[in-house]
Structure formats: C-alpha cells, structure tokens
C-alpha cells in the first residue's frame, strides 16, 4: 500500500507546473474550449510519466556514481552498467564484489520504483473516480457547468424543497477527500473530467454558492451543517490554492465569520461585498422566481448576506479555476481563458 503525505516542496509540484505551463502555451491557437480541454487532458498523464522518468534517472545517476568510485570504469561505462541494473536488463557483468553489490542495490531500487509507481497509479485512479462520481450525480440538479441557483431551482421542482439536494455531510466528505487527494498527489488536480462542461472547481463553487444562498434566505433546516459545509469549502479552496501550505484560517475561525455574517454582526458592506454583477444576479432571481423558490423581495434582501459569505471563498475559487483552465459557467466566469458553456454547441 502506498500512503503519500502532503508536502509544500517536492518534485511532483515542479514537474506538474512545468508540464502544464508548457501545454498552455498553444491554447491561444485553439478556437474552442472543447479543443483546449482535449489538449490539456495530456498534462496529467505526461506529468506522471515525467515523474517516473526523473526518479529512475536520479537512481541511475546515483548508482553510476557508486560504480564509478568502486571500479576503473569510465563515466560512460559506469552509467551504462547502472542503467542496465536499475532497469533490470542485466546486460552487463559486475567488475568486482563492491560493484556487484551496487548493481544488486540498483536492481532492487528499480523494482521498488516500478512497484511504488503501480500502487501510485491505483491510488490516483481511486481518488479520481471518487471525485468524479459525486460530480456526475451532482450535475443532474446543478447543470453543466454547475450553477448554484440551478441547484435550488431544480430541487424545488423535483422534490418540492429547494434544499433537498444540499446534502452537507456528503459534500463535506467529498471536499475533504479532494483536499487530501490533491495534497498528497498534486497532479490529481490536472486530471480533467470526462465531460468538458464539468470541472471540480466549478462544482465546488456552485455547491458553496447554493448553500450560502439558501442560508442567506433562511431556507436551510440545519444551519449548523450548512455553516460547517461553507467553512470546509472555504478552507479546502484556500489550502489547494496555496498548494498545501499552512494557513492561519482554522475551521472555527471560518465558521465564526459565516455565523457573524448570518447573524448580522459582521458589519456587512453591501457594495464592497458584491462579487456578482447585476445582470447575472437578475438572471438567478428570475430562475428562482420561476420555480417558486422564494419571493423576489426575499431574494434581493438576502443578496448582501450572500455576497459577504461568498467573498470568503470566491477569490480562491477563481484563482484555481484560472490556473486549471476550468470551464466558464454562470457565476464562475471571472477567470480569463475560458468560454461560456453555450458556445460548446458549436464545438467540433
């Protein structure tokens, strides 16, 4: 069993960033987001293979140095013997007893790297499936790309309650799994969803928006769970944006901020807290009215509270969406380099 641990500094971060940065260079020459998404699907597999190649190369260099110091072989001969032993080809004969021990060690390390790599791939696949399965089910009510108000509207239409689809406990588990998986394996963030209209950053943002909006309008039955859900999402986005670095924000501190906003003791600035323009907000209001989620006056009065809660996580969500080149959807279009989902109809 391979059990990796989170780290702020490591080869995985460097390789993933370099590969993804290089693959982003030709995106401007691609006309549609679907083409861009298909191209960026190469980033994660290339990063994984590059990590394997680099680790094997480092072991070969280390064994070559040992062999060179123990024998009269040249650098080229020592390097060839190290490469043959680490890759278990067995095409060279040890020169002396010490070089034979070094060759055996190199062969063992080569097998260990391959075994660990196979376990690593299994772990990546399991984490990817766990992340995508809930998102696929979530898309049935959130739409693709996911949108917070759509969750409340469809839930109201299907179940007669706008919060029926907001399973805060399930989403808190999902967010913690996403955070743990991507802290342990940074390349997991770059594995893209099978559908180009779906992305984990947009799904997380829409779920937080739906929970924050429902809480602002007083629709949630279990306010404590909703507050914990928003706090967990806020911290998850902050940690992933900082690539696992330690942050000062704690669960209780974030929960307290949300609680103060809902209770009206946080000194809300209606103008400064707004992160959604009037056109996008009115579109959501019309949708919620159409499905009888709430009266227009109740929705409008909840806007300052909702915007203040949203300000806790929106910057980190947008930064991650921009960095990962996520699909642009309603209320998630603040990052550059994406297109609106409606243009996907014309994609080839």
List where the protein language model places each region.
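Non-transmembrane accessory domains of multi-pass membrane transporters/channels
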Residues: 133-204, 209-210
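Membrane-interacting alpha-helical segments
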Residues: 12-23, 76, 80, 168, ...
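Pore domain of cation channels
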Residues: 48-134, 209
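Juxtamembrane/interfacial segments around transmembrane helices
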Residues: 31-37, 95-112, 154-164
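Generic structural signal for hydrophobic core residues of well-folded globular domains
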Residues: 26, 69, 125-128, 175-178, ...
